[in-house]
């Protein structure tokens, strides 16, 4: 279908772009409204701290909770579930359930966010609205490529 083809092309562009090592699909469920689902997913997917933890292979649920907290979405920390899975697997590795860290081995959590593609599953457990956002990690190569050069006036335009 056309949507699938467009999504795969967008992911290919991401994989080819400026030092990206991970493509992440954020699946947000259990929001009170579509607007909340969108706001929460965007907040996580656009968070510099979350993106850098992805690059480091760190399944840092604290940064995800932080990003959810400053989104415009209604979030009750004690209800949030967070899990990761390989994009080609339906097996979710939970790092947080009902706002509490799981006893999942750290190595298993790290394996779920290895380079390539993975899915991040966040359930706010408040309602029925869902959202999906595609994001990428933030690497030194990306920063170096985009930082500009104040000694080169040509870099000021882009």
Summary of predicted features, one role per range:
Residues 1-56:
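A glycine- and small/hydrophobic-rich beta-loop-beta segment
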């Amino acid at each position: 279908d056309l949507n699938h083809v467009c999504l795969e092309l967008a992911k290919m562009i991401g994989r080819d772009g400026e030092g990206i090592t991970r493509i992440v699909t954020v699946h947000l469920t259990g929001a009170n409204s579509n607007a909340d689902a969108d706001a929460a997913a965007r907040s996580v997917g656009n968070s510099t701290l979350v993106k850098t933890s992805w690059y480091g292979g760190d399944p840092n649920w604290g940064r995800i909770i932080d990003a959810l907290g400053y989104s415009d979405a209604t979030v009750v920390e004690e209800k949030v579930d967070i899990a990761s899975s390989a994009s080609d697997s339906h097996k979710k590795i939970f790092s947080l359930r009902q706002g509490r860290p799981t006893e999942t081995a750290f190595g298993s959590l790290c394996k779920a966010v290895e380079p390539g593609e993975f899915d991040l599953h966040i359930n706010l457990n408040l309602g029925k609205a869902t959202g999906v956002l595609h994001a990428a990690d933030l690497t030194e190569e990306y920063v170096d490529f985009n930082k500009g050069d104040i000694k080169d006036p040509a870099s000021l335009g882009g």
